[in-house]
Amino acid sequence: VREFESLPPHHPLKQNIDADFMKLLYRNQSQGQKVLNFMLLTAFLSLVLAYIIGVTNGHHEPWLPTISELDETTPEGTLWSAGLTAAGVMSIPVWIKLYQKWDGQLRSSNADRKWLWFNLLFVVMAQIATVSFIWTVNLPLNKYPIPHGVTAGLYFYLTLLLGTVAILVVRKIDNYPKDIIKIRLVLNLAGYVSMALLALTVPEGVKPLFMYKDLGADHLHSVHAMPSLFEWLMVFTAQIGYFYTLNHDMEGESIIE
């Protein structure tokens, strides 16, 4: 064992074992976890690759475009819109499965009937948020600034609220891991703080949801670098939360029975 631990990370034996472990890890995931993680990976790569391509091509300043500005110019705009649309569609069955699992767990826990309604509220909010998200990424910011701002705002608000509702619901499930609840709580609060800081750091006289329209098409990204930073933090906070908490909830679950 000591001899193995002393091997450098690039040693073929260690690399083979690491590769086998990753295959085993993926193989041992449930169908629900695979769909969830593929959805999250698709969304993450769509954002990061679109940013890298846009900056490399000189379409955007490195510090810092808003996420929606990545949709202005191809090829990153095509990748951004198509990838995030696909991620949104993939999330729909995940929300439904999550609702079904929590419903069964709440009933098994003899939870008050109102929490069944809160769970229903959760999935309805999640689906409305998803539809808003899909509309947002298919209504280019430079062509449809107002519809884009409205749907983006609805998506962000609902995402934070459904995170809060999820915390209230899972607290009523017997033996639900307290560490998962704590992660949900911390990341949900981080999302609210990021949204508040975004609103507080927008340039004077500019509405947060319609920043692009108020500033004009040729503005410098540096003007809204801080609001953009908090927007990116909101998105990645949500993705981290989904990864760490929903992987627990989707354990052993199938999307297609």
Language-model regions, residue ranges each:
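Non-cytosolic membrane-interface motifs at loop->transmembrane helix junctions
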Residues: 143-155, 221-229
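Alpha-helical transmembrane segments in multipass membrane proteins, preferentially the mid-helix core
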Residues: 160-176, 195-204
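Early transmembrane hairpin module of multi-pass membrane proteins
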Residues: 23, 36-103, 110-123, 127-152
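Short, positively charged low-complexity motifs
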Residues: 3-4
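Transmembrane-helix exit/juxtamembrane "anchor" motif
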Residues: 55-56, 96-99, 168-174, 243-257
